[in-house]
Amino acid sequence: DKKEPDMFLLSECKAPEENEKINLGCLVIGSQPLKISWEPKKSSIVEHVFPSEMRNGNYTMVLQVTVLASELNLNHTCTINKPKRKEKPFKFPESWDSQSSKRVTPTLQAKNHSTEATKAITTKKDIEGAMAPSNLTVNILTTSTHPEMSSWLLCEVSGFFPENIHLMWLGVHSKMKSTNFVTANPTAQPGGTFQTWSVLRLPVALSSSLDTYTCVVEHEASKTKLNASKSLAISGIVNTIQHSCIMDEQSDSYMDLEEENGLWPTMCTFVALFLLTLLYSGFVTFIKVK
């Protein structure tokens, strides 16, 4: 008999304002071709589908939706329609507090980072003019139970103003095709700046050879160009679990995995997938365009 597919729901850990949009993700891994959907289908829901792909004997598919926070409710359900119907309803992460009236839930619990968060809001409160991006990272997405998911890279950038920004990916020898990656719309962060991310699907499976992929960020308003690269060698993986919120197959509650390196202490970054593995040889260079 075919094994029943595994199903994982993802949610932003940071609670949205009522007038904001929130990203939800549904990751399904199974031994047969899959057809999944988010329900209910409404005009206010924006979908992005990463097509089903087979790796190591399993089919993997990711469906991301962007929903208005004011319309978010427990009726949102990720459904496998093929080969056999299976459902998993969205559930508010425990880090959200329904006591708040202005938010769907309050801000994420910053734990030891409350001082840094307050400082960021204070020092950047009244921003005049352009602000150059200050944080740029590239990480590989993978899980210990499903190594086939190691075919994704995540690029995150934050601290810029205004919000207009351009992200692209460079491969080993050339620019990556736009069909291989998706970039989120910039969202506001404390202090009046913005942040965004881009996810790249690698065209081939990782091997023992060393390949380098680069995320290039161009912020025209501040005349700034950043790039961050990741050299991938499967033997060089160092597991570092970053902060994310995921509801797995065996549980009805979210796991809140705290980011070890504290790159973005004032927020919980939503990623298209869920467990980030930090590979060696990552570096960031800053180029100021005159």
From Swiss-Prot:
Alphabetized SMART domains for the sequence: IGc1
Q: Which residues are glycosylated?
A: 58, 75, 112, 135, 227
- The yes or no answer to whether the keyword Transmembrane helix is present is yes
- Annotated region Disordered: where? 89-111
Regions of biased composition (Polar residues) lie at 96-111
Q: Where are the transmembrane segments?
A: 262-279
Question: What is the name attached to this protein's record?
Answer: Ig delta chain C region membrane-bound form
Q: Per the UniProt entry, what species is this protein from, by scientific name? A: Mus musculus
